[in-house]
Amino acid sequence: MSESSISSSKPSVELPQATWSHLQRYPALSKFIKYAESLPPVERLISFNLVVLGSVNQWVSESSSSPRLVKQVVAAGKEGAFKLDELVNLLVFKEGVDGLLYNWKSHSNTPGIWLVWFFVDYVANISNTLLREFLIKPLHLQGSTASKEIGSSGEENKVTDASSLPHVAELSSTTRGMSQEIQSKVKSNYIDPTKDLAKEKYDAIVKPTTDKLQSVYIDPTKTKLNETYQRFTTVYENNLSKSESVPKAIVSTGLDLGNATIEKLKASREDQTNSKPAAVSTN
């Protein structure tokens, strides 16, 4: 299926051409394609497929009765197909097949260790390109400068010295820069705002509650406990110095503290009793 046959059969159908055009650059494959296209069954099959694609395209994309969402989905699918076609053309044929043939000729058609370096660099090249297309560009990251772009010409993508592993160095630079930029974006866009919001909520809600608990309950209770401990220690030491017996001092201390507590309760009750008539008389 040559470009002329596509355009003449169904001019309204736009198909990905990058990979197909590149395949015809190989002489043996180009001859086979032309021979296959000349066969009547293949020619009829191509024409039938083009007619079907043209009808579907006219009904879905160009018809006014087609829903807008369907048109958007079809347009996105077309864009993805062209992008995939260019990606396959770049990675498989330009960087893969053409690069291998170029290095094969530059090494006098002789295999050697350069094949290992070429394979390692080729894998790094694929990884680097996929990172750029599916991670760096969608996330709008800067990354490092690309040595090639999808859709660029094949000659400038040839690897002249595979042993230097240029794409391995490029992949290392890309991943390092991407990691640093992602960490920076996560910190500035998520961690810092979340930290500031949490501090604001703490100052507005939690801190007043903890301060109130501290001042109303914890500090007074702590003061009373210290006073009770000091009073117990003083009474115990006095009783111990008088009796010189630990058990007697403990018992005496308990009795003294109990009597002091009872006296305080009586005093508080008397104060409450005296305050009630005063409150009645005021009314």
UniProtKB/Swiss-Prot annotation:
Subcellular location: Lipid droplet; Membrane
GO cellular component: lipid droplet; membrane
Pfam families linked to this entry: Perilipin_2
Keywords: Acetylation, Lipid droplet, Membrane
Modified residues (N-acetylserine): S2
Highest taxon listed in the record's lineage: Eukaryota
Bilayer topology term: Peripheral membrane protein
A Gene Ontology BP annotation from the UniProt entry: aerobic respiration
Keyword Amino-acid biosynthesis: no
Remarks, miscellaneous: Present with 2157 molecules/cell in log phase SD medium.
The protein's name: Protein PET10
Source organism: Saccharomyces cerevisiae (strain ATCC 204508 / S288c)
